[in-house]
């Protein structure tokens, strides 16, 4: 099996893409319904399509959207455990404004060497971010989502971006820390690595979305 993203343990995915080469011919509807009977409750096949043999979703990925949830609450909420980063502080307009201001220099094509884990040894660390946007969750005023869209990502890149933004908002890093980390390429200038719980791979765009998709009316 070949996936579109290598998500860390504890990270969630709403739109992970997986390809495999079957030994039997079954239409996409049959795969979607049949696999559902054999998967655990926290994994679901929401769409199936036919792609060429040997298709690798990771190499066909042209854009991804991640969303990270932060909940500002001194008390633990059992309904959100494992699905948010709980911060014992108050979410107000000043926090949101600081996050938005700190995120602004991250949009565009930059060298994100300071925003990757030590385990990531890829030569090229240049990536393009189209969106870095914090917004309050309309269904939960305690929480906000930070949406990050880009052409590709380094290991732990989104989690370090989020950690840096929140470090500045909480006064643990000086204003402009994200921009300085971009310029220096030094991991020490960036913030902490946010925990995996709040991160969701929300959308994956591929150069080839496949054929005969089922269900046909579900967005890819």
Task: Label each PLM-derived region with a short phrase.
Residues 1-220:
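Structured-RNA-binding interfaces characteristic of tRNA pseudouridine synthases
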């Amino acid at each position: 099996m070949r996936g579109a993203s290598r998500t860390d343990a504890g990270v969630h995915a709403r739109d992970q893409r997986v390809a495999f080469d079957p030994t039997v011919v079954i239409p996409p509807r049959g795969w979607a319904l049949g696999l559902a009977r054999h998967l655990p409750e926290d994994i679901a096949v929401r769409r199936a399509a036919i792609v060429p043999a040997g298709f690798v979703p990771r190499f066909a990925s042209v854009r991804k959207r991640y969303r990270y949830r932060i909940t500002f609450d001194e008390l633990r909420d059992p309904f959100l455990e494992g699905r948010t980063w709980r911060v014992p502080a108050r979410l107000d307009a000043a926090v949101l404004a600081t996050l938005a201001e700190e995120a602004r220099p991250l949009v565009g094509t930059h060298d994100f060497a300071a925003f990757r884990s030590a385990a990531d040894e890829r030569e090229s660390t240049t990536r393009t971010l189209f969106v870095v946007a914090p917004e309050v969750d309309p269904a939960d005023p305690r929480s906000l989502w930070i949406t990050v869209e880009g052409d590709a990502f380094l290991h732990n890149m989104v989690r370090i971006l989020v950690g840096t933004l929140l470090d500045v908002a909480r006064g643990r890093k000086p204003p402009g820390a994200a921009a300085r980390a971009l310029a220096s390429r030094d991991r020490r200038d960036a913030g902490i690595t946010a925990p995996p719980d709040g991160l969701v791979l929300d959308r994956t765009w591929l150069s080839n979305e496949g054929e005969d998709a089922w269900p046909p009316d579900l967005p890819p």
